[in-house]
Amino acid sequence: RQRQMCIRDSHNIVFIDSDKILMSNDGGVFLTTDGGNTFTMKNDNMVTTQFYSTAIHPTDSDYVLGGTQDNGTWRLNTAGKQAGVEVYGGDGGFAHIDQVDPDYQFGATTYGNIFRSVNGGQSFGSYSNVTNSDGTDAGFFINPSVIDGVNKAMYVTFDTVSILRQKDYTKLSAHDFININLGSGATAYKVSPHTSGVLFVGTASG
């Protein structure tokens, strides 16, 4: 389809002539035949989207929520190679669906920017954007997080010595910090499926 611009993060440019140019970028392959005034997306039958994270619905295996590299967060809920619905723009980050109550779904953009759905993914709104005390971004660019569907808690990487905990994600609750010197930022989480309140953490250094 035609559009007035293509995605800015380009990886390669091929000049066919002075007006016809092929570009590859985070959105796939684009062609301009008028020197860059308009672009046509050339992604038919090509898989060009990279998912950072996906979450699967507990009762509908065709329903997937996923954050993609520079292409937003998408909801896919039909079998096969069908078009999905972009539920949030920008860079997509970690995605979560509450396995106990799937009305609660979460996605993220960059750093501590988290958005939430309370109606099963039909709509999303901004939920949390925690920053350092000086207002700078906290955590990683694509920031790891996890939810505990039993206790309705969310854990988010903050810095090398603390993990942010949202105590009750069913509402706009206060957060606190789990202060532990990890040596490096937390990059992976796993909520114990056996013992309530137990969280396993992996870090950038092991």
Model-derived regions, located:
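Beta-rich catalytic cores
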Residues: 9, 25, 50, 91-92, ...
